[in-house]
Amino acid sequence: YKFINAGNQHLIIETKKVFSYDLDNLSSKVRRRKFFKNVNISLFTKLPKKLELRTNEAGAGETLSCGSASAATASFNIIDKSSIKIISAGGELSLRKINDKLEMIGPAEFICEGIWLKN
């Protein structure tokens, strides 16, 4: 596993089958520890030329995609390559290393709308 600060904190765990784990249950157990209370937790699987990624964001639960988790995961998997694809439930992102920065390219879609209720 890796612990990375990408503007927010991420615990990134490599697994053989990213979709075979109960991510909500795992995240709940990890966050019981004081140090990991507000950490985003991601699982990833390495595939040829791409990574599969699932993320449980602190305070939100599992999300379709997470840009900071994608960047955090790519940051230590892109070392010998100039770019990598990340596949999540929300779609595909391409991340490219340019000098010491990461460029993220992918679609954005409107998926829902809500109303803020005041007490």
Identify the meaning behind each predicted range:
Residues 1-64, 72-119:
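Active-site proximal loop and beta-alpha junction motif in alpha/beta enzyme cores
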